[in-house]
């Protein structure tokens, strides 16, 4: 199993970097076209106007939020994803509000954001130092919204295969959905399921406690 975990980690690293240009196609295939809808499940949970997206990927949700009037910033470690996102924004007449940064070292002031979003994040979302940083840059009462755990409805062989593949590739990265494991003293956590005609997806909403300082 450890060898499998290493193989999956290697594959995802390639997908996020050298093969980032295939990311949108791959995500559409493995989700049977539900990927963007799954990402957008975060939007109704946002509060305020200042939003940070962690690991923005190819920038689809970052663009959606910007187009809807949110004052967004996105961070990602992948130069290839940054180039794809920057090009997407330029083609639409905007500069991409992005920078390269780690969740464990966010280059923003305390209370800089009203909401934060991460869709299908890697293991960093469960890292206590990253969670402390996320709490630090959120205003008291601010929201961290995490979308995770997509599941396609239906019992046909292709759907069963995709759901199985999603489980065995995502699980090695986090052991379980972030919505089931996320825990930090600075946050009060709620977990929800968003259902549409073809699929369901998990949404975690972690509200920054007003009387709890990060690191205290």
Mark where each language-model region is.
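Conserved class I S-adenosyl-L-methionine
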Residues: 1-46, 60, 64, 159-166
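C-terminal alpha-helical "lid/dimerization" subdomain adjacent to the S-adenosyl-L-methionine
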Residues: 10, 146-202
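Class I SAM-dependent methyltransferase SAM/SAH-binding core
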Residues: 52-54, 58-105
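A short acidic, Gly/Pro-enriched loop at the edge of an enzyme's catalytic core
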Residues: 104-116
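A short SAM/SAH-binding and catalytic strip from SAM-dependent methyltransferases
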Residues: 115-128
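A short glycine-rich, Lys/Arg-flanked "PGG" loop and its adjoining helix->strand segment in the class I
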Residues: 129-140
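C-terminal lobe and adjacent flexible extensions of AdoMet/dcAdoMet transferase-like proteins
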Residues: 204-216
């Amino acid at each position: 199993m450890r060898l499998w975990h290493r193989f999956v980690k290697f594959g995802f690293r390639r997908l996020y970097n050298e093969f980032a240009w295939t990311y949108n196609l791959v995500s559409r295939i493995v989700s049977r076209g539900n990927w963007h809808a799954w990402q957008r499940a975060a939007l109704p949970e946002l509060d305020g106007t200042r939003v940070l997206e962690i690991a923005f990927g190819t920038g689809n949700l970052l663009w959606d939020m910007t187009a809807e009037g949110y004052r967004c910033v996105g961070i990602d470690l992948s130069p290839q994803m940054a180039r794809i996102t920057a090009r997407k924004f330029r083609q639409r007449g905007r500069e991409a509000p992005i920078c390269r940064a780690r969740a464990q070292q966010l280059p923003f002031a305390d209370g800089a954001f009203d909401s934060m979003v991460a869709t299908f994040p890697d293991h960093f979302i469960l890292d206590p130092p990253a969670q402390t940083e996320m709490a630090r840059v959120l205003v008291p009462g601010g929201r961290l919204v995490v979308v995770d755990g997509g599941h396609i409805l239906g019992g046909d062989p292709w759907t069963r295969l995709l759901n199985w593949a999603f489980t065995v590739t995502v699980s090695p990265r986090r052991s379980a959905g972030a919505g089931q494991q996320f825990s930090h003293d600075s946050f009060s956590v709620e977990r929800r399921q968003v259902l549409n005609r073809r699929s369901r997806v998990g949404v975690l909403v972690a509200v920054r406690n007003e009387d709890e300082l990060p690191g205290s």
